[in-house]
């Protein structure tokens, strides 16, 4: 796994690993619902020990191929076990030799309904750098419209994003929708690649899924490499 990628050749890794909540990866999205597809499916319900061991191996290999000024963006969400929320902060164990710069809250506006707790409308995106100070951060490339802009008070109609990103999920009728049952939006990946890389840099996604990372990287003139679960 990743053995063909040279050491210290990747500028940025962005990924969203399997949730380990019994989603049938390999199924298809059809008519706004998940339907069974032919072929082998990844069993997204490993033991917790096996799941963490798998992620640990992937993260270890990512660090090997990451440049000294490289960065990792890791999307993961809370899980619920026995009616108790399980935050994903255990992943910090795998990044003790890196620098946590942000925990971005990805906020979206729709999802599943619940009756005995508030509906969840966010996931985490952990932003780690390999070097404490030396890393790419193209802030000007990801500025957003300032809704309260006043020419008498502000020089620009743009402002810096915060660590809360309001980006909608990919809906069933979205032009970017694929058959993958758990697809993250191009807008999310685009902001990450823009802020963390330059044209020609190599972007890695070890859990390629629907191919969103590759689509965005190509559009932004970045090189890319990705893997998918068999």
Model regions and ranges:
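Core catalytic lobe of class I
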Residues: 1-230
